[in-house]
A protein has these predicted regions:
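P-loop/Walker A phosphate-binding loop and immediately adjacent motor/lid segment at beta-alpha junctions
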Residues: 85-95, 143-201
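Core AdoMet radical
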Residues: 42-58, 72-86, 100-118, 127-165
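Alpha-helical scaffolding segments of alpha/beta enzyme cores, especially the outer helices
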Residues: 62, 88, 92-99, 125
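Short, charged beta->alpha transition segments
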Residues: 60-68
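Short gly/pro-enriched beta-turn/loop segments at secondary-structure junctions
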Residues: 20-22, 71, 99
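Canonical Radical SAM [4Fe-4S] cluster-binding loop centered on the CxxxCxxC motif
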Residues: 3-5, 10-58
Length: 204
């Protein structure tokens, strides 16, 4: 199975927290149906990722092989575009990444609740393989993203309306999640030793 992939970045510090000095690699899925249909998230600035034809079809095994060759850490963030527009491929990619012991973070404009309403069986397979989901539409009026900031949380999350959902203890038999709202109340975010999510301090 292939993924329509726009690009990837290796060993960067702007793709979320990790246990390895906040280094992660990032995979950019090409295409966002919401944007292509004329209804992008308000203020979305990833224009080059909207169009599916901007990507190249790459096999899932080739993607993992490239990460294994080039990554110094086993932490990966999957963004778009919209990764869940390629849901079957996303699930298979995450299953393979998990076999290689990667910590997986996925960012989607779809909410967790909408995902379950849309295709409960498939999304539960996805949740069973990933560690963290950042969900919800980007809203420029609630922007917290700052690519000049040394703060890890603000270097990869777009706006305060988005939720951080800890799926580290989720399984098909034990559907445990912990959801964090209003994340701007926290100073920063980190990954616990067990792979779950933690937050530092409060801005209030």
């Amino acid at each position: 199975m292939d993924i329509n992939l726009y690009d990837y970045r290796i060993n960067i510090k702007t793709a979320g927290p990790s246990l390895q000095g906040n280094l992660r690699s990032e995979l950019y899925f090409a295409g966002c149906k919401k944007a292509e249909e004329g209804d992008p998230c308000r203020g979305c600035f990833n224009y080059e990722l909207w169009q599916r034809e901007q990507g190249s079809h790459v096999s899932i095994q080739s993607i993992v092989n490239r990460l294994e060759e080039m990554c110094s850490v086993k932490s990966v963030t999957i963004v778009g575009g919209e990764p869940t527009d390629q849901l079957d491929g996303l699930i298979e990619l995450c299953k393979l990444l998990k076999k290689y012991n990667y910590h997986i973070l996925v960012i989607s404009w779809h909410t967790y609740e909408d995902m379950l309403r849309d295709d409960k069986e498939k999304y539960e397979q996805l949740f069973d393989t990933i560690d963290v989901l950042v969900d919800g539409q980007y809203d420029e009026h609630q922007r917290i993203y700052d690519d000049t900031h040394t703060n890890v949380m603000r270097s990869f999350i777009g706006s305060n309306n988005q939720k951080v959902i800890d799926l580290n203890k989720y399984s098909l038999d034990n559907k445990t999640i912990v959801a964090y709202n209003n994340i701007n109340q926290y100073e920063d975010m980190y990954i616990k030793k067990d792979g779950g999510v933690g937050f530092n301090g409060s801005n209030h």
